[in-house]
Regions:
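Internal catalytic-core helix/loop-beta-alpha segment
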Residues: 72-128
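Catalytic metal-binding/acid-base residues of hydrolase active sites
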Residues: 14, 51-53, 100, 125, ...
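Short, well-ordered secondary-structure micro-motifs
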Residues: 57-59, 105-108, 132-133, 159-160
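A short acidic, often aromatic-flanked loop/helix-cap motif at beta-alpha or helix-coil junctions
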Residues: 54, 77, 100-104, 154-156, ...
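Histidine-anchored nucleotide/phosphate-binding helix
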Residues: 33-40, 131-141
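Structured adenosyl-cofactor binding patch, chiefly the S-adenosyl-L-methionine
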Residues: 137, 153-165
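Active-site acidic carboxylates
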Residues: 1-96, 162, 166, 174
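A short glycine-rich beta-strand->turn/loop micro-motif centered on a GG-aromatic cluster
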Residues: 120-127, 143-158
Length: 177
């Protein structure tokens, strides 16, 4: 691993992606590992949160995927085990986003991928938001060492999770298994 400034990006660990409308057994299974990763992380941490408001905007996502992560609902909130750890790390940022990647941010800190030498991603969904953010990080910061902790990610299905990991690996992103 490179030495230098480190960032852990915790992607969309929200109730709707874990236990709710878009949840899965695989997503539920990663919660303890993500919690431990955050607890022992030695660097900055950024949490992203998918966020939609009512009435839903006329976007492809809102037509293609069931309504989810409606701001202010239980489904929108970070899962309890992750929120508890977030509360133990004052000063870490939450980026609320309306798109798959952090460039859709409407509120949040000014954390930028270019500011880091080592970036690691965990969370949901491997094949949507995790891959989007990881590829943008690769594009924004071609010199960073970028990692995906495959055991701390879950996709929309086990097959799509594996496909996304393969694509990221082919784009010079380290996939740690």
């Amino acid at each position: 691993m490179k030495t230098g400034k480190k960032l852990l990006v915790v992607v969309d660990m929200q109730n709707d992606f874990i236990y709710g409308r878009l949840g899965s057994k695989e997503a539920q299974e990663i919660v303890p590992a993500v919690r431990e990763k955050i607890r022992h992380w030695d660097g900055d941490i950024m949490f992203t949160m998918d966020s939609h408001t009512l009435p839903l905007k006329d976007t492809f996502e809102n037509h293609a995927i069931r309504p989810h992560c409606i701001e202010g609902t239980e489904g929108w909130k970070l899962v309890y085990d992750i929120k508890e750890i977030y509360d133990e790390h004052p000063g870490q940022s939450i980026k609320v986003k309306e798109k798959y990647n952090r460039f859709g941010i409407t509120r949040g800190s000014t954390t930028r991928y270019i500011d880091y030498d080592y970036i690691e991603f965990v969370g949901t969904c491997t094949d949507i938001c995790v891959i989007s953010n990881a590829l943008i990080a690769r594009s924004e910061n071609p010199h960073a060492e970028i990692h995906i902790d495959a055991n701390c990610c879950a996709g929309t299905s086990p097959e799509m999770h594996e496909e996304a990991l393969n694509v990221m690996s082919s784009c010079l992103i380290y996939v740690d298994r």
